[in-house]
Swiss-Prot record:
It comes from Arabidopsis thaliana (Mouse-ear cress). The lineage of its organism: Eukaryota, Viridiplantae, Streptophyta, Embryophyta, Tracheophyta. The keyword NADP does not apply. This is E3 ubiquitin-protein ligase SGIP1. GO terms for cellular component: cytoplasmic stress granule. Induction: Up-regulated in heat-stressed plants and unstressed progeny in a HSFA2-dependent manner. Residues 16-65 form the F-box domain.
């Protein structure tokens, strides 16, 4: 009699033979709960995983979650350069930073240089029109006539195309610009309304906060009705932190944020509640970053920064 042969199943070294592919919807949900660093590492697992960060459903979900937990963003001038209009850094829009002739995404580490040859080029500003990221605006002052015009372009397209927009109110661009619902302003965002926030001058330090400052809010844009409130503090800022403080902006909750401007020890962020007339200070420790920067380096502080993993290409 022939001996019966037993069928032997060898254990496989590959788990893929026993596992099904993870549904893309589940991958999007998993990736949305990870940090940007973990997302970058997960891209090395497989081609499917590497494609998730480029899916629009994922980038919009990640941005939505990130918007619910805004952060403070600090930027430093390279090698302690002297601040000027050539290296001015503008407030981020949907996670994108803009400076002279460049757009940068801190979350992905990408940098774009949209080419535009213009005489009298002023700067590149971030624009968030119709919930579309990666739009940039270049205000240009025509030196001959002092007229003002803008050119708008969208990053990530095969060919960079600039669209000319004439401004009905000729003016020179201001530094502290913001974008609210696709409209470019040069003031402050006060709970979704246009606001002006400035300190009451004290001596030669016209931008330094001492004992009081003024907040004006555009309550009715059609009738140009502005509210005006003067906040007089019951204490001196220098006694609170023993340093000069400058206005950074206003949070979505209505708190006014102030900070020092240079990399000195200690570095403070102060949150002022105008309703209760109270302030809370937080010391920021930069660790090894501070050791690599020149003493007294200029620091740009931005509030309500959100992480955006959308790619520029």
């Amino acid at each position: 009699m022939e001996k019966s042969q037993k069928q032997v199943t060898r254990p496989s070294n590959s788990r893929r033979e026993y596992s099904k592919e993870i549904p893309i919807d589940l991958l999007i949900e998993i990736f949305s709960r990870l940090s940007t660093g973990d997302i970058a590492r997960c891209r090395c697992v497989s081609k499917i995983w590497s494609s998730v960060p480029r899916l629009r459903d994922f980038t919009e979900l990640f941005l939505k979650i990130s918007s619910a937990r805004p952060r403070i963003l600090f930027t430093f001038l390279h090698n302690g350069m002297v601040p000027s209009y050539d290296n001015e850094i503008h407030a981020p829009v949907r996670g994108f930073l803009c400076s002279k002739a460049s757009v940068y995404n801190p979350s992905t580490g990408e940098c774009a240089y949209p080419y535009l040859e213009l005489l009298g080029l002023w700067d590149i500003l971030p624009v968030d029109a119709e919930n579309l990221a990666k739009k940039v605006c270049v205000p240009k002052v025509l030196l001959a006539s002092e007229d003002f015009a803008c050119r708008v372009s969208t990053l990530g397209t095969e060919e960079v195309c600039w669209r000319m927009i004439q401004c009905s109110l000729p003016h020179r661009p201001f530094r502290d610009e913001i974008c609210i619902d696709g409209v470019l302003y040069y003031l402050a965002n006060c709970k979704g309304k246009l606001g002006i926030l400035w300190p009451v001058p004290s001596g030669d330090q016209s931008h330094e906060v001492t004992r009081s400052f003024v907040l004006r809010i555009l309550e009715d844009a059609n009738k140009l009705i502005w509210s005006r409130t003067v906040y007089t503090l019951s204490f001196n800022w220098k006694k609170l932190v023993n340093k000069s403080l400058y206005i950074v902006g206003m949070t979505s909750g209505g708190e006014i944020v102030l900070s020092t401007r240079h990399l000195n020890y200690p570095f403070y962020i102060v949150y002022y509640n105008p309703v209760n007339n109270t302030a809370a200070k937080n010391e920021i420790q930069f660790g090894n970053i501070a050791n690599k920067k020149a003493e007294n380096s200029r620091i740009y502080t931005f509030i309500d920064h959100v992480e955006n993993v959308e790619h520029m290409d």
